[in-house]
Amino acid sequence: MSLLLGVTSCHWFNPDDEVVYDRTVLAYIAAENSLSYGAFHEQDIDEMLQAAGDIPANSRLLIYLDDTSNPRILSIEQQSGRRPTSRVVHEYSEEQNSGDVETLRTVMEWVCDHYPSSSYGLIFWSHGDAWLPAKAVPQRSICIDNGRNNYSNSGSKMDIADVADVLDGFPCLEFILFDACFMQAVEVAYELRHVTRHVIASPAEIPNPGAPYERMVKPFFSVPFDGAEVVEQYYRMYNDSVISVFGYGSDRYGVSLSVIDCSRLDALADATAEMVTKYVSRDEATDLKGIQRYYPLSSKSRPEFYDMNGYMRRLIKDEADYVRWKSVFDLAVPYARSTAWWYSNDAYTQRVDLDNYGGVSCYVPQDRSIYDGLNEKFRTTSWYVAAGWQEVGW
């Protein structure tokens, strides 16, 4: 189900640079947090090993692994007639903070120096909280590092804007996959639009088992890159199988996903700004009751993550205007899938409004007397200006 998507403003290697591999995919696994306690990183590495035979001969799948041992870089390999292995190709002599963008920078430098490639993919594996600043509550945006503590989630974390600044110094990525909660937010993708062609993620929480890598390694290396197939394989694992939260009972995991074509995000910002400036009142917040929201169950009142299509459908009063906006949205989000429910906070499932599901979340500025702190944080995003919110005084 290949999608021929547009071209971003990404930059590339100088043509004189040596290119050895067709594509190198790096999984940046920041596991010094509660996910390590559950050994979920080990399960996912095992899944990658199962799919080692799907890695093309002239491509590489690397893992930067920071768990409770010293950080190291692994190469997933399968030699003819032998079992797949995760070979250590680089080991760090001391502890690193994987929730620091400088660590991301040094890892990317090492990978690009030692595996020069025509294209790259990047997987962020950890906890995530979309566009919220790293100093906001809860205290993370992407990749928590608690040192050698694997019981909690209170350690260092990276702001998405800082991640974008670091990645801007490297060859344009073919894709970024967030195997982390809440990261398919339009504010996140817009921040990353110059450093990657595609963003694949969930607007909601990700179930503990995460991505089914044994299904997804093959499309990671597709040419042209097939982001829709990555989404489809991820979705199918949860839709086609009954995976019970406890191993018994009716509670079962679900997942919501989409792929964003970053070359279309400026057009989406323009179309959204047109509608925001036409339909948003400077003095009265939009009625948000009944619009699909994504949240941890323990924080059900959090208003950060509304389904973008659901919100815009409510906001735009003229059907012709909505159809026009939706046509731009569909180019920016060419493929989205969701089970009938989405997973939340270990043991609960929430129904998905499939009729209005867009697969991408957005923040909507709200009552200043209650949410002005969140509104203020939203004003620090690039999307706030691009999508017209500054112009209407929110």
Give the role of each language-model region:
Residues G6-S9:
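C-terminal motif of bacterial Sec signal peptides marking the signal peptidase cleavage site
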Residues E32-S34, S126-L132, C181-A185:
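Gly/Ser/Thr-rich loops at beta-strand to alpha-helix junctions
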Residues H11-P116, Y384:
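N-terminal extension/subdomain marker
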Residues M1-S2:
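Sec-dependent signal peptide recognition
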Residues T24-I29, R60-L65, G121-F124, E174-F178, ...:
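Structural recognition of the beta-strand scaffold that forms the well-ordered cores
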Residues A31-E32, D67, S126-G128, Q366-R368:
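Residue-level signal for short, function-critical loop segments
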Residues D66-V89, S119, F124-N150:
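Surface-exposed loop and adjacent secondary-structure segments within mature catalytic domains
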Residues E18, D113, V137-W394:
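Terminal, contiguous helix-loop blocks that mediate binding/assembly
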